[in-house]
Design a protein with these regions (language model features):
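Short, motif-level signal for alpha-helix interfacial/capping segments enriched in acidic residues
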Residues: 116-124, 169, 301-312
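Core catalytic region of metal-dependent phosphoesterases/phosphodiesterases
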Residues: 121-141, 149-269
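Short, glycine/acidic-rich beta->alpha junctions
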Residues: 20, 165, 273
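N-terminal short leaders/motifs
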Residues: 71-84, 225-242, 289, 319-324
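Peripheral, non-catalytic segments of secretory and membrane proteins
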Residues: 23, 46, 204, 380-381
Length: 387
């Protein structure tokens, strides 16, 4: 281990090598053509980066920590002769490094089983229903939740199971409802159980999580690639809508932006912004507004739509609000607005099962017509998915 391990550029490595050969600031500056003050700043920056990882020999710090951690404190024990005989290193998560590692894992998930970047999928020659849109609604999926059946009384659930279940459900629904011009993959929020590597919700509530964050992000990247590619085989255009939930409001942002980057050169894929927790689209005379459903009651949902989407309301005659959060289906009609929450595919975790919560598990696809609003729908239950 040396300072060379903490250099990011050839210039930094050159300076460190000369410094380790015994050259001072002035001689190094003369040899490589920069000021002695620049040499000093380079070395201080490299030493600071190394010390943050636990490496600073001049301070008897030689026990390093992993790349995604920072040293919080070091306790060194010396003998009577003043020589170090033991050391205790305290570390803490480096959030910036964890984010960088997470993004690298996400990118790896995209490129898994792909030679190079995204390869366009051949569009269907025609679709039977140019005036229709198939909305594939993913209720709170809690992809990386951990549920153990002896404890919860329901099915097991982990990252691998969640991935397999969703791929099967979407495949069955696309096979049944894929003759529409547009397919909209709508994630109604809480796709991830935890918001970060702390294994907590955004509010700080600890949750039972399966898998390290990097692995989960890699799986999420690959999973959405598979789902959208499957939809592109049948629909001429695919929309991706990621609603931000209460479990994963920040994770949903990076998920959305990474998908936008991945499909940047695919004109058949449209990724909706999700900077706001409210997202909407118009399909002919149909208005659809989406929100996770957290921290807002039915009456407030209705008031928000009529107030904030007044122009869209005036242009349409069929208006819907889709939300998740409560893990089961409810339907309410209020003042010309149809409000509906959708079911989920995941079982309840230990906390919710102990509190008596649970519901029928399913995923739905709603067919919307430009002129007539909701035309029909398809649903696949968990038993059919697992069959």
């Amino acid at each position: 281990m040396s300072l060379l391990d903490y250099c990011n550029t050839d210039r930094q490595r050159q300076i460190v090598e000369l410094h380790e050969q015994g050259l001072g600031y002035t001689k190094i500056s003369q040899q490589i053509g920069i000021t002695r003050y620049s040499v000093r700043d380079y070395l201080q920056s490299i030493k600071s980066r190394a010390a943050a990882q636990g490496y600073s020999p001049e301070h008897d710090m030689t026990r390093t920590v992993p790349d995604v951690f920072k040293v919080r404190g070091v306790s060194t024990y010396y003998n009577e002769d003043g020589k170090p005989v033991g050391q205790w290193v305290k570390s803490m998560a480096d959030k910036e490094a964890m984010l960088e590692a997470s993004l690298e894992a996400f990118k790896a998930g995209f490129l898994e089983e792909i030679d190079g970047l995204y390869k366009p999928v051949k569009a269907p020659e025609s679709t039977k229903n140019e005036d229709r849109l198939s909305a594939y609604l993913i209720g709170d999926h809690h992809l990386n939740a951990l549920c153990w059946s002896p404890e919860t009384g329901g099915d097991d659930w982990d990252t691998n199971i969640a991935q397999d279940v969703l791929i099967r459900a979407v495949d069955k629904l696309v096979s049944a409802a894929g003759d529409s011009e547009v397919g909209a993959l709508i994630n109604l929020g809480d796709f991830l159980h935890a918001n970060s590597g702390d294994n907590k919700t955004a509010k700080g509530t600890p949750v039972d999580v399966d898998g390290r964050l990097g692995r989960v992000i890699r799986i999420v990247g690959n999973l959405f690639k598979v789902l959208i590619t499957r939809m592109l085989e049948t629909h001429k255009e695919v929309w991706l809508i990621n609603v931000r939930g209460n479990h994963d409001p920040d994770a949903s942002l990076w998920l959305n932006e990474m998908m936008r980057l991945y499909f940047h050169n695919e004109p058949r894929v449209k990724v909706f912004d999700n900077f706001s927790k409210w997202i909407h689209f118009e399909w002919g005379k149909t208005l659809v507004v989406m929100h996770h459903g957290d921290r807002v009651k039915t009456q407030a949902l209705y008031e928000a739509v009529t107030r904030d989407y007044a122009e869209e309301w005036g242009r349409t005659t069929h208006r819907y609000l889709y939300h998740g959060h409560i893990h089961h289906r409810t339907v309410t009609e209020l003042g010309g607005l149809h409000l509906e929450s959708f079911g989920v595919l995941c079982p309840p975790d230990s906390f919710h099962s102990a509190s008596g919560y649970g519901s029928a598990r399913s995923m739905s696809c709603v067919i919307l017509d430009k002129n007539y609003g909701e035309h029909s729908r398809f649903k696949v239950g968990i038993d059919e998915v697992k069959a």
